[in-house]
Swiss-Prot record:
Phylogenetic lineage: Bacteria, Bacillati, Cyanobacteriota, Cyanophyceae, Synechococcales
Gene Ontology MF terms: ATP binding; UMP kinase activity
Originating species: Prochlorococcus marinus (strain MIT 9313)
Name this protein carries in UniProt: Uridylate kinase
InterPro entries the UniProt entry points to: AceGlu_kinase-like_sf, Asp/Glu/Uridylate_kinase, Uridylate_kinase, Uridylate_kinase_bac
Top-level taxon of the source organism: Bacteria
Primary localization: cytoplasm
Reaction(s) this enzyme catalyzes, per UniProt: UMP + ATP = UDP + ADP
Family the entry assigns: Belongs to the UMP kinase family.
One Gene Ontology cellular component annotation held by this UniProt entry: cytoplasm
Keyword GTP-binding: no
Transmembrane segments: none
Known pathway: Pyrimidine metabolism; CTP biosynthesis via de novo pathway; UDP from UMP (UMPK route): step 1/1
Record text on activity regulation: Inhibited by UTP.
Key words of the record: ATP-binding, Cytoplasm, Kinase, Nucleotide-binding, Pyrimidine biosynthesis, Transferase
Length: 237
């Protein structure tokens, strides 16, 4: 395997499947089965999950909610997704722990960096919920932060598109996909991959990001093996 320790970022929207809201159990089980295959080969894997399938703080703020309050609601939505992922993973035979940045001891462990690393060393998947515990920060930024904290080799951003494009491929059929690019290219070009804080964190800590299509069967395993899928972002192309 090309990577020993991986941080997998899943958007909340990815868990919806073809639905317009909520969680598609079939998608959760498909992700769990792919993760199980990777973990069985010895890769240590942590997950950060978003909450946009249930609530998105920016939309709440745009509708008149206080931004910080809306972000806290979004953080709670990520915990719902994290617990759902834990259930799917454990049904797939993967021992899993949920750690949350907002303490809720009845359903999850509090986020403790050293404990998270110990879980990974024991072959458990750790799902991080609750964002980073502070408003005004995205779950993409949380993914970069947790990756740096647990000394991950790479961040996988598994999404609905098969990589990074020079413009929106849904609106522009002639959009060009990048096989590889630098963090500086992403920041300078304002490419819609992750927010600038998330990109800068990975840049400063020299953690590459691989963006790929979550819904292509086996892609998580291919990415862990270092196969050339999606787009790779790093300090040097």
């Amino acid at each position: 395997m090309a990577y020993a320790r991986v941080l997998l970022k899943l958007s909340g929207e990815a868990l919806m499947g073809d639905q317009s809201y909520g969680i598609d159990p079939a998608i959760v089980q498909s992700i769990a089965e792919d993760v199980a295959k990777v973990v069985a080969k010895g890769t240590q894997l942590a997950i950060v999950v978003g909450g946009g399938n249930i609530f998105r703080g920016l939309k709440g703020s745009a509708a008149g909610m206080d931004r910080a309050t809306a972000d806290y609601v979004g953080m709670l939505a990520t915990v719902m997704n994290a617990i759902t992922l834990q259930d799917g993973l454990e049904r797939a035979g993967v021992p899993t722990r949920v750690q949350t940045a907002i303490e809720m001891q009845e359903v999850a462990e509090p986020y403790i960096r050293r404990r998270a690393i110990r879980h990974l060393e024991k072959g458990r998947v750790v799902v991080f919920g609750g964002g980073c515990g502070n408003p005004f920060f995205t779950t993409d930024t949380t993914a970069s932060l947790r990756a740096a904290e647990i000394n991950a080799d790479v961040v996988f951003k598994a999404t609905k598109v098969d990589g990074v494009y020079d413009r929106d491929p849904k609106r522009f059929p002639d959009a060009t996909r990048y096989d590889s690019l630098t963090f500086q290219q992403v920041l300078s070009g304002e490419l819609a991959v992750m927010d600038s804080t998330a990109i800068a964190l990975c840049k400063d800590n020299n953690i590459p990001i691989v963006v790929f299509d979550l819904f292509e069967p086996g892609n998580i395993g291919k990415a862990v093996a270092g196969e050339a899928i999606g787009s790779r972002i790093s300090n040097a192309t």
